[in-house]
UniProtKB/Swiss-Prot annotation:
It comes from Prochlorococcus marinus (strain MIT 9303). Gene3D superfamilies: 1.10.150.530, Aldolase class I (3.20.20.70). This is Probable dual-specificity RNA methyltransferase RlmN. Its cofactor is [4Fe-4S] cluster. S-adenosyl-L-methionine binds at G167, E168, S197, S226, L227, H228, N302. The lineage of its organism: Bacteria, Bacillati, Cyanobacteriota, Cyanophyceae, Synechococcales. Reaction proceeds by a ping-pong mechanism involving intermediate methylation of a conserved cysteine residue. Belongs to the radical SAM superfamily. RlmN family. Pfam families: Radical_SAM, RlmN_N. PANTHER family: 23S RRNA METHYLTRANSFERASE (PTHR30544), RADICAL SAM CORE DOMAIN-CONTAINING PROTEIN (PTHR30544:SF5). The gene is rlmN. GO terms for molecular function: 4 iron, 4 sulfur cluster binding; metal ion binding; rRNA (adenine(2503)-C2-)-methyltransferase activity; rRNA binding; tRNA (adenine(37)-C2)-methyltransferase activity; tRNA binding.
Length: 356
């Protein structure tokens, strides 16, 4: 291992395991315990700079900085807090890009919603994240930092993680899996409390199943597949990239994922007023997922300022849920949070860009 580079040739420490940091410290001519000290300051104490890690020899800290190594922390440039304490952070990367992360508190838990890319290439009609297209994928340390930044901002330890922010996680599989390993092992968040959401990218679900077993030993996180429609025609209207991924092929890949990992799949379905929220849509959806070891999570649409989609009324939402339940489908309704502070995915970033 090079004495001037971190594992994998990275320049940021965040994302490295205790074992990797110990081995790297030894390669740097330091005792192995220096690596354990680094690990403690990175993950338990949330250090933002080498200067803050005063237990390390000053000469080594200076050397690390001179060689361009960093902790890998991002800079908070904006914060929005809703009346229910839902907190959205706008974080800046070293190359000047911005990403969003959201903390969603309840009395029992703190769920953090993470971005996996800067922007998004999927261009879903109802989502703010894809309006500006994709700039790039995030590195592992940029994903992990979002959890630390929300922990600092909310002064509370996150208990659950969902990859439901900006970007398509399955177009950044390696960094997402590396960050899951870090969140699990280094930050102590159980895999079963981590959810990876995807709109569906051809050939990636089998790849995810295989890589998760290799990288993590076992895939215990939850896979959430965003359907948002009960048939191919309507799905293509809402998700342009769906034209390359037939509905039945997507479901077959979900069955393969279940067979390989033993983990049931969650199907996400955003309810759009008068478009996909009628009883006949619920009947068709129930027919699609019947007999599938799965769970359907309904999401009422969060309005975006310049879009024509509408949020269904509560009676329509309940009627849709009831149809699924009566057809034997396991179903839940996600509570909407942070509506008063532009906390829907991608909205704070768009607002910041418009001002800037």
């Amino acid at each position: 291992m090079s004495s001037t580079h971190l594992p994998g040739g990275n320049q940021a420490l965040l994302g490295c395991s205790a074992t990797e940091l110990e081995s790297w410290a030894v390669a740097e001519g330091q005792p192995a315990f220096r690596g354990r000290q680094l690990h403690d300051w990175l993950y338990a104490k949330g250090a933002r700079s080498f200067d803050a890690i005063t237990v390390l020899p000053k000469s080594w800290r200076i050397s690390l900085q001179q060689r361009g190594l960093t902790i890998g922390r991002l800079l908070e440039v904006n914060r929005a807090v809703a009346v229910d304490d839902t907190t959205k952070l706008l974080l800046a990367t070293v190359d000047g890009e911005t990403i969003e992360s959201v903390g969603i508190p309840t009395q029992q838990r703190l769920t953090v919603c993470l971005s996996s890319q800067v922007g998004c290439p999927m261009a879903c009609r109802f989502c703010a994240s894809g309006k500006g297209g994709l700039q790039r994928s995030l590195a592992t340390h940029e994903i992990v930092d979002q959890v630390l930044s929300l922990r600092e901002a909310m002064d509370r330890r996150p208990s659950h993680v969902v990859f439901m922010g900006m970007g398509e996680p399955l177009l950044n599989i390696e960094a997402v899996l590396a960050s899951i390993r870090c969140l699990n092992i280094d930050l102590g968040i159980a895999q079963r409390r981590i959810t990876v959401s995807t709109v569906g990218v051809p050939h990636t679900l089998p790849q995810l199943a295989e890589l998760a077993m290799k990288r993590l030993g076992r895939a215990q996180f939850t896979l959430a597949v965003s359907l948002h429609a009960p048939n191919q025609e309507l799905r293509e209207r809402l998700i342009p990239t769906a034209c390359a991924y037939p509905f039945e092929t997507l479901l077959q890949d979900c069955r393969h994922y279940l067979a390989v990992t033993g983990r049931r799949v969650t199907f996400e379905y955003i309810l759009l007023g008068a478009l996909n929220d009628q009883p006949q849509h619920a009947e068709e959806l129930a027919e699609r997922v019947r007999g599938f070891q799965s769970h359907v999570n309904l999401i009422a649409y969060n309005p975006i300022d310049d879009e024509g989609f509408q949020r269904p009324n509560p009676e329509t939402i309940e009627a849709f849920r009831r149809v699924l339940e009566q057809r034997g489908v396991a179903v839940s309704l996600r509570a909407s949070r942070g509506l008063d502070q532009n906390a829907a995915c991608g909205q704070l970033r768009r607002q910041h860009a418009a001002i800037g």
